[in-house]
Swiss-Prot record:
Membrane topology label: Peripheral membrane protein
Organism placement in taxonomy: Bacteria, Bacillati, Actinomycetota, Actinomycetes, Mycobacteriales
GO annotations of cellular component type: cytoplasm; plasma membrane
Catalytic activity reported: (S)-dihydroorotate + a quinone = orotate + a quinol
Compartment(s) where it occurs, according to its Swiss-Prot or TrEMBL record: Cell membrane
Keyword hit for Membrane: yes
Name this polypeptide is given: Dihydroorotate dehydrogenase (quinone)
NCBIfam families in the record: PRK05286.1-2 (NF003645), PRK05286.2-1 (NF003648), PRK05286.2-5 (NF003652), pyrD_sub2 (TIGR01036)
Length: 363
């Protein structure tokens, strides 16, 4: 019933611009955030509270493996709400040291034929100091990560201090931090994935916080570059890698080529990035999987795809576009599917399935 209702609501939402809908949903989430009884009521219905899904990961207890990916709650305006909707955690941001408006609108587009979204938002956010104020008003201990990126007007040569500022302001308010050097929508940002550029950024963030530090990488890296980042991650002793961000590739889309071209530049999330994100995850796990946590994100639409990421080496998962197209029941279905699959394989915890290559057996 809820799924059918959401499908009808989605048709209505798709008559409005994507960014307008995002603002409406954000306001709704802020309302749920502000009214504790409403938040508790939602939280009594949607989450899958199954002990088999609970994990201790880099010293943090995650009640469920699927989290909200960065990009939705950019300013930490509803940090307590995401657990009520069934997410095991939420990654807030991307946050930059200084406030910035992002790129000119329109900058957010739907590709419904591909169950995808194209965005060139450009890290629009209120800045680390204001986000810190929001987080200091939190009302729960739900798990949150914070994704930090480079301020657009800051030159690449000054990126280290820019990331350091964000880490100092936000590190102690999060359960973990993610260094974002992989968005395609800030000029020159992806160049910071090069090992010699990334090393001092990681060091600065690690020095500025006591919480686990991870790095988020692009799906468009070459295999050699993936290996180089993985080796650096081990060398620097970071907690994990988030794989992957959006893709700049336009290959294999069902949406007509001219329609996509008219949308312009940006990163694509959703189904089109699924296969490459899985390949990157598999390569990372083969290379460094026993030495750090891998978070699988990118095109997870079904419980089977979620299971495939775990079996390929992901300890935790994230999604954003899947929620847009699937609604709150998408979160619930993912968790029910993972729990059922664990039991189908006679496993008692997710960590036993990570990297196991066990197949999806449910019909």
């Amino acid at each position: 019933m809820r799924t059918k209702a959401y499908a009808l609501a989605l048709k209505g939402m798709f008559t409005m611009s994507p960014e307008r809908i995002h603002h409406i949903i954000t306001r709704g989430m802020q309302l749920v955030q502000a009214i504790s009884p409403l938040r508790r009521a939602v939280g009594s219905i949607l989450p899958v509270n199954d002990p088999i899904l609970r994990q201790e990961v880099f010293g943090v207890t995650f009640p469920q493996p699927l989290g909200l990916a960065a990009g939705f709650d950019k300013n930490g305006e509803a940090p307590d709400v995401w657990a009520a909707f069934g997410f095991g955690y939420a990654e807030l941001g991307t946050v930059t040291a200084s406030p910035q408006p992002g790129n000119p609108t329109p900058r957010l587009f739907r590709l419904p034929a591909d169950k995808a979204i194209l965005n060139r938002m450009g890290f629009n956010n209120l800045g680390a100091a204001e986000v810190a104020k929001n987080l200091k008003r939190r009302k729960s201990d739900a798990v949150i990560g914070i994704n930090i990126g480079k301020t657009k007007v800051v030159a690449s040569k000054d990126a280290v201090n820019d990331y350091r500022r964000s880490a100092l302001l936000l590190g102690n308010l999060a359960d973990y931090l993610v260094i974002n050097v992989s968005s395609p929508n800030t000029p020159g940002l992806r160049d910071l994935q090069a090992v010699e550029s990334l090393r001092p950024i990681i060091a600065a963030v690690q020095e500025s916080t006591s919480v686990p530090v991870l790095v988020k990488i692009a799906p468009d890296l070459s295999d050699d570059d993936i290996d180089a980042v993985a080796d650096l991650a081990v060398e620097m002793g970071i907690a994990g890698i988030v794989a992957t961000n959006t893709t700049i590739s336009r290959n294999g889309l069902r949406t007509p080529h001219q329609d996509v071209a008219d949308m312009g530049a940006g990163g694509i999330s959703g189904a089109p990035v699924a296969q490459r994100s899985l390949e990157v995850l598999e390569r990372l796990y083969a290379h460094v999987g026993t030495e750090m946590v891998l978070i699988g994100v990118g095109g997870i639409s079904t419980p089977q795809q979620a299971w495939e990421r775990i079996a390929a080496g992901a300890t935790l998962l994230q999604g954003y576009t899947g929620m847009i197209y699937g609604g709150p029941d998408w979160i619930r279905d993912i968790h029910l599917g993972i729990a059922a699959q664990l039991r189908a394989h006679d496993l008692s915890s997710i960590d036993q399935a990570v990297g196991s290559k066990l197949p999806w057996t449910l019909q």
